[in-house]
Swiss-Prot record:
Keywords: Flavoprotein, FMN, NAD, NADP, Nucleotide-binding, Oxidoreductase. Coiled coil: none annotated. Binds 1 FMN per monomer. GO terms for molecular function: flavin adenine dinucleotide binding; FMN binding; NAD binding; NADH:ubiquinone reductase (non-electrogenic) activity; NADP binding; NADPH dehydrogenase (quinone) activity. GO terms for cellular component: membrane. Its cofactor is FMN. InterPro entries: Flavodoxin/NO_synth, Flavoprotein-like_sf, Flavoprotein_WrbA-like, FMN_Rdtase-like_dom, NQO. Belongs to the WrbA family. Residues 3-194 form the Flavodoxin-like domain. This is NAD(P)H dehydrogenase (quinone). NAD(+) binds at Y11. The lineage of its organism: Bacteria, Pseudomonadati, Pseudomonadota, Betaproteobacteria, Rhodocyclales. Substrate binds at W102.
Length: 207
């Protein structure tokens, strides 16, 4: 059973969450987990001035995702920071290149899931995940979120990202806040949950 985690990260917040999602998925017996980043669209000079170029060196080793690899997966988990309540342009550009897969029905029946990050507590976590779900539904994917059996998302003793739609982190207006341990654990849960469901579907189809 193969799980692909496709993400975009500018300053490392989503990368850290992606690592946690991958860790959770790998905890499921038989799971083969791959981590991939979508191509960057921002010019190098802009990345350098913003400090993102340096931050991205931490995950420069992660292979770049290609749309033709997606049909190989049984589950695909997408990670994107929010941009005005929607997925980032880099992820939108990547998904907009999957028209050929849609024509062939290549992703129909595969498990799809989404996690995100925002600058503020109410900065578009839910709308970003839900709007990304629309694309996955057009592809015929089976959506999986973060159920309330992950009790940590109900905590009231700290500021947290995350909702039933998927794990999330709050980066802060200046990007200085990295994912908390609770947010990391929620991301692990989502990865494990997705992999368990994908594994059950694969076994069921083989029966």
């Amino acid at each position: 059973m193969k799980v692909q985690i496709i993400f975009y990260s500018m300053y490392g917040h989503i990368f850290r969450m992606a690592e946690a999602v991958a860790e959770g998925a790998r905890s499921v017996a038989g799971a083969e987990v791959g981590l991939f980043r979508v191509p960057e669209l921002v010019p190098d000079e802009v990345l350098e001035k913003s400090g993102a170029k340096t931050a991205q060196q931490a995950f420069a080793h992660v292979p770049v995702a290609k749309t033709e690899q997606l049909p190989e997966a049984d589950a695909i988990i997408f990670g994107t920071p929010t941009r005005f309540g929607n997925m980032c342009a880099q992820m939108r550009n990547f998904l907009d290149q999957t028209g050929g897969l849609w024509m062939k029905g290549s992703l129909v029946g595969k498990v799809g899931s989404v996690f995100t990050s925002t600058a503020t507590q109410h900065g578009g976590q839910e709308s970003t995940i839900l709007s990304t779900h629309i694309t996955l539904l057009h592809q015929g994917m089976v959506l999986v979120g973060l159920p309330y059996t992950e009790k940590r998302q109900m905590g009231m003793d700290e500021i947290l990202g995350g909702s039933p739609y998927g794990a999330a982190t709050i980066a802060g207006g200046d990007g200085s806040r990295m994912p908390s341990q609770t947010e990391i654990e929620m991301a692990k849960f989502q990865g494990r949950h997705v992999a368990e469901i994908a594994s059950a579907l694969v076994r069921g189809r083989a029966a």
